[in-house]
Amino acid sequence: MAKIVECIPNFSEGRNQAIIDGLVETAKSVPGVTLLDHSSDASHNRSVFTLVGDDQNIQEVAFRLVKYASENIDLTKHQGEHPRMGATDVLPFVPIKDITSEECVEIAKTVSERINRELGIPIFLYEDAASRPERKNLAKVRKGQFEGMPEKLLEPDWAPDYGERKIHPTAGVTAVGARMPLIAYNINLDTDDLEIANNIAKIIRGSSGGYKYCKAIGVMLEDRNIAQVSINMVNLEKFPLYRVFETVRFEAKRYGVGILGSEVIGLAPAKALIDAAEYYLQIEDFDYGKQVLENHLLG
């Protein structure tokens, strides 16, 4: 039985449609891999792809995408609201079916070695693949971003896991890892005050004393002139969607600010959305396995 892996590369390009189209074409170039979704954000200047495939072919398409990005994205000319350090900024592998997290760690290491050997891009391993505890957190790995990486790589504790202590001149540095599924979730505030978004992000994120399974930053969407709380939710069983939404709404109200809306980036597990519906509709004794029609149709 095939071992199924999800790969969610994040690219530092969300404005040039020709480059995005090239990434889409590359993502579809390997048999046995399906491009499930891709989304681009001009304000963030970033694109997120979601692919699934068997454990061998997913490695090939991941390498091809990193290669295409390194040849077509120049970070010396990049501007955007989202933190970034590489043309392919992050490359996580997620176990989906008949494969363990430990096996995904080995996939991450194999792909990392090839990327560095053939493309000359230094690699940091993160999350479950991290070589040391302080590298599990992507925010710590990416701190300094592209512009600060040349100096960071010379620090005693920040030698890349693969490659020399110097960045690729245009493609920067890539973080490759293995992790469990997460939701990338953004909440748009009815204000143009970035400080409010930053303050709310600080309150909810685990690293500053908030929710353990929440990562958050404040960003400014220049094209809409609004502030946004950009969130990664890394454990949906222990930290559901509705809880972060209600917390952000409560904190925003303290500033006299409302919420314009929210968005899910990429794909999300159905149960996470059903849990939110169950909470807001106050459904009693709901059984997700038995009462969702599609669960029966899909077997």
Predicted regions and their residues:
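Long, contiguous binding/interaction regions
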Residues: 1-299
